[in-house]
Amino acid sequence: MDVLVPLLQLLVLLLTLPLHLLALLGCWQPICKTYFPYLMATLTARSYKKMESKKRELFSQIKDLKGTSNEVTLLELGCGTGANFQFYPPGCKVTCVDPNPNFEKFLTKSMAENRHLQYERFIVAYGENMKQLADSSMDVVVCTLVLCSVQSPRKVLQEVQRVLKPGGLLFFWEHVSEPQGSQALLWQRVLEPTWKHIGDGCHLTRETWKDIEKAQFSEVQLEWQPPPFKWLPVGPHIMGKAVK
């Protein structure tokens, strides 16, 4: 079946030729940076309704980190529209990092709707290089649907470990590759070159759980979840936490 992948990729390319030409000419990225926040606002609102109970379960563990100050320093990496804010407990001091500056107005709206949080700042940066943040400055890093689209998951996870305090937690929720040998994986491979343009660099076939397990955290807890939308080529999800 592998021999079919290049042929089917070519067919998809021909069907979406205008998009690929815009990308080749350097015109697509500015368009994508503008429309992508609106797309994410729509999709996250729908998907979070399906995942709400699991999200609340995952992020409820943050309150256990509160010390005598009753505060938690929290970095949301690839913050997007701020859709996770509703799940964070009171007392979180939230710093947001995203390479797309067009998300900031969505973040402002989300913060206005979540007064139980303290909004520190929004940093325009890539996860591979968060030099604006000091070493061991965060109790928690949250990373949801981000490692699929970064240039180097390994470097991002190194930066996460750098900014986390000793014993700090990484909470993650990521979509990953379909099982090896499955027909679903074949279609992910076919669609991925085009999907990366549509999804602002999103990869469909990453085995992100391997990156997390190799990142030298002292402990990793991980569980699998089915994809929220059957009509999208996005595969199963992994959720969990890792301890520095």
From Swiss-Prot:
UniProt GO BP: methylation
Tissues/organs with expression: Highly expressed in liver and kidney. No expression in testis, heart, lung, brain, spleen or cultured fibroblasts.
Keywords assigned by UniProt, alphabetized: Cytoplasm, Endoplasmic reticulum, Lipid droplet, Membrane, Methyltransferase, Microsome, Signal, Transferase
GO molecular function: S-adenosylmethionine-dependent methyltransferase activity; thiol S-methyltransferase activity
Catalyzed chemical reaction(s): a thiol + S-adenosyl-L-methionine = a methyl thioether + S-adenosyl-L-homocysteine + H(+)
InterPro entries per the UniProt record, alphabetical: Methyltransf_11, SAM-dependent_MTases_sf, Thiol_S-MT
Any one cellular-component term (Gene Ontology): cytosol
Chief location bin: endoplasmic reticulum
CDD domains xref list: AdoMet_MTases (cd02440)
Membrane topology summary: Peripheral membrane protein
UniProt record similarity statement: Belongs to the methyltransferase superfamily.
The protein's role, per its UniProt record: Thiol S-methyltransferase that catalyzes the transfer of a methyl group from S-adenosyl-L-methionine to alkyl and phenolic thiol-containing acceptor substrates. Together with TMT1B accounts for most of S-thiol methylation activity in the endoplasmic reticulum of hepatocytes. Selectively methylates S-centered nucleophiles from metabolites such as hydrogen sulfide and dithiothreitol.
Protein name as annotated: Thiol S-methyltransferase TMT1B
